[in-house]
Amino acid sequence: MYAIIETGGKQYKVEEGAVLFIEKLADVEGEVVTFDKVLLVSKDGKVTAGAPTVAGATVTGKVEKHGKAKKIIVYKYKAKKNYRRKQGHRQPFTKVVIEKINA
């Protein structure tokens, strides 16, 4: 059984027990989070697609931890003009373990 959910402007294919690194959520570590935007559910070979979401379907997971991704460097310059800017960025994320798919 699997489902496709939408969170943080992205879509993820999830199964029970799967570990996801998603855009940061405001929930506290150890808290149970429910995803209501379920776009597709597959159960025993039967696929149910929503328009745009599957009615009554939810996915629950547990927030494991919050963190920041590896640093990326943003560097811009203009040739021959002595203009250089260097900036780093670390995107915050939330690690979620999927517990149950309710379809």
Curated annotation (Swiss-Prot):
GO terms for biological process: translation. The keyword Ligase does not apply. The keyword Nucleus does not apply. GO terms for molecular function: rRNA binding; structural constituent of ribosome. Coiled coil: none annotated. InterPro entries: bL21-like (IPR028909), bL21-like_sf (IPR036164), Ribosomal_bL21 (IPR001787), Ribosomal_bL21_CS (IPR018258). It comes from the Bacteria. Keywords: Ribonucleoprotein, Ribosomal protein, RNA-binding, rRNA-binding. Part of the 50S ribosomal subunit. Contacts protein L20. HAMAP family: Ribosomal_bL21. This protein binds to 23S rRNA in the presence of protein L20. Belongs to the bacterial ribosomal protein bL21 family. This is Large ribosomal subunit protein bL21. It comes from Brevibacillus brevis (strain 47 / JCM 6285 / NBRC 100599).
